[in-house]
Amino acid sequence: MPHMLYTEIPTQRPVTPLLDAIDHPQQLRQLEHSQLLQVADELRQYILYAAGQSGGHFGANLGVVELTVALHYCFNTPNDRLVWDVGHQAYPHKILTGRREQITTIRAKNGLAAFPAREESVFDTFGVGHSSTAISAGLGMSLARRYQKDPCEVVCIVGDGAMTAGMAFEAMNDAVAHDADLIVVLNDNDMSISCSTGGFAKHLAAIWEKGHLVNVNEHGEAYIQPHPKWTYNSRLHQSATDAADNLFKAIGFDYFGPFDGHDVTQLVQVFNVLKKRKGPRLVHVYTKKGKGFAPAEADPITYHAIGKINAASGGKTPPKYSDVFGEWLCDEAAQDERLLAITPAMCEGSGMVKFAKQFPQRFFDVAIAEQHAVTLAAGMACEGLKPVVAIYSTFLQRGYDQLIHDVALQNLDVTFGIDRAGLVGEDGPTHAGAYDYAYMRTVPNMVIMAPKDENECRQMLHTAYAYNGPAAVRYPRGAGVGVEIQKEMTVLELGKAEIVAEIKANSDEQITVLAFGSRVMVALEAAEQFAQKHDVSVCVVNMRFVKPLDEQMIRDLAEHTHLFVTVEEHAIMGGAGSAVNEFMAQEQIVKPIINLGLPDSFLHQATHNQMLQDCGLDAKGILNSIERAWLKVNQVV
């Protein structure tokens, strides 16, 4: 039965008789080998349908259908552990482990998580979302089961993009040191989100081009049939390459492959052989991102993720903040040849495609290597250049030591464009940018800005670039508020806030709202409603800078303020509001103050607006919080 190639995403649920009978992998394991091809085809059809209903990660899931079927067929899950790296390719896994009918709720409020989550299923052995953690976690499980004298098979499924991170090799090195019983499946599709880059990607390509196969015949096992690409090769009774030519063997792993990751029959043979071996083993499988859906095979970057196919397109939307960043980057680079741009494998997501094409010699995609990205920038700055690092807030966490030790400690001139700051909606807690104020504002020499709109974002990026030292601009996911973006760039006064509204009332009482970043315009809306409803004056301030704060403005406003309110799309603990609290305490400014922001909990996925409502950070929620606080200030019961 050949692989089916689909050209459209179905709007009606496909007929999937074999798949419908699988609510547990044990039922899959009761099928004949010959039925697995049909299971894989039904699974691929169902993923096409489900992704169209819910949106979400797409190409990676289509690419691991046969691999997932083979893994659950050969290994005794959940007792045997499957550890998925990153997890955006886990939809087939979720469908085969009792969540078939729920898969259309993925990424929705109260629905399935976008990634494997331990609280969701016993089959989700490790919670993921960030890259390159699977081998470390899997090694920990293997060593724990060895210690408990209850061994099991632990299989880590890792993409070639994830293997570019140092953590993966740290874990492999340690696995060899412990002679751990661990299987690493290298899912090689030459992609992370963008195309894989660097020496490791070239190494994998070299292995592939040699066309050698592993003949797992050392103990009389059946010969593994070759991938069609290699039918001209005779049988080989040796490993893919000599140890000197194979990085994995040089580290100390037994290496098998590369195999066709879409040949489910061969994969079953391979995994059944490997179960009989011990020690650290690596299976190299070659897959195609978007397999089985023609548009995704042709354009895997665009089809990394998709939206709901029936979602209303609406009218024209403002530019995304990532696009504002990308336009600024090109404009700034045209004026200053010292500008170099760095991204850790997020060229498209960070809005850098245009820059990469326009200035290819000044663009550095370092793969999934956030620590390296930050220190690479530090080294460039040491030579008098002005590097700009484009990075998601949640991923900068991985380079925190480098931010402190390699950049800030030396007061190096590095600009950080921090994307996806705040809540990120359907991607859930693993991708939320909830902590960057807290982890950056404690670092000496750092300047931190947050724009109220897309035009101010452009001006802040220019300001950060002009500043001679480490500076960060953090901006949210998605579109701006719709203001006109000025082509001319101006440098903002460092640490200077902006009063956006002074709403006067008949009473002498005043509330001051200190708003940061994405919450400024929403706080203004709430303030206007409060002033009109309660006849109380309200001053709304766009703070602009988290560090340095506009301390003088706070002092001046405190003389007339009866209640301070801080508002931010960031964790309350350690955030911008905490910085205001600390300053007021040091200055002995004794005024009532409330801090509005994200609670001390990990927030599960929903739409961005739903999450803001749940946190009380929409206009209605901010208004309600101000009203409650004002009642307390006036001791009204």
Swiss-Prot record:
Chain positions recorded as Mg(2+) binding sites: 160, 189
Cofactor entry: Mg(2+); thiamine diphosphate
SMART domains assigned: Transket_pyr
Keyword Iron annotated: no
Listed GO CC annotations: cytosol
Cofactor note: Binds 1 Mg(2+) ion per subunit.
Keyword annotations from UniProtKB, A to Z: Isoprene biosynthesis, Magnesium, Metal-binding, Thiamine biosynthesis, Thiamine pyrophosphate, Transferase
Listed CDD domains: TPP_DXS, TPP_PYR_DXS_TK_like
Signal peptide start and end residues: none
Broad class of enzyme this protein falls into: transferase
Amino acids binding thiamine diphosphate: 88, 129-131, 161-162, 189, 293, 370
Record EC number: 2.2.1.7
Metabolic or biological pathway, per its Swiss-Prot or TrEMBL entry: Metabolic intermediate biosynthesis; 1-deoxy-D-xylulose 5-phosphate biosynthesis; 1-deoxy-D-xylulose 5-phosphate from D-glyceraldehyde 3-phosphate and pyruvate: step 1/1
GO MF term set: 1-deoxy-D-xylulose-5-phosphate synthase activity; magnesium ion binding; thiamine pyrophosphate binding
Catalysed reactions, semicolon-separated: D-glyceraldehyde 3-phosphate + pyruvate + H(+) = 1-deoxy-D-xylulose 5-phosphate + CO2
Subunit-level organization: Homodimer.
NCBIfam families: dxs (TIGR00204), PRK05444.2-2 (NF003933)
Function: Catalyzes the acyloin condensation reaction between C atoms 2 and 3 of pyruvate and glyceraldehyde 3-phosphate to yield 1-deoxy-D-xylulose-5-phosphate (DXP).
Family under the similarity heading: Belongs to the transketolase family. DXPS subfamily.
PANTHER family: 1-D-DEOXYXYLULOSE 5-PHOSPHATE SYNTHASE-RELATED, 1-DEOXY-D-XYLULOSE-5-PHOSPHATE SYNTHASE, CHLOROPLASTIC
Name used for this protein in its record: 1-deoxy-D-xylulose-5-phosphate synthase
Source organism per UniProt: Acinetobacter baumannii (strain SDF)
Native organism taxonomy: Bacteria, Pseudomonadati, Pseudomonadota, Gammaproteobacteria, Moraxellales
Gene: dxs
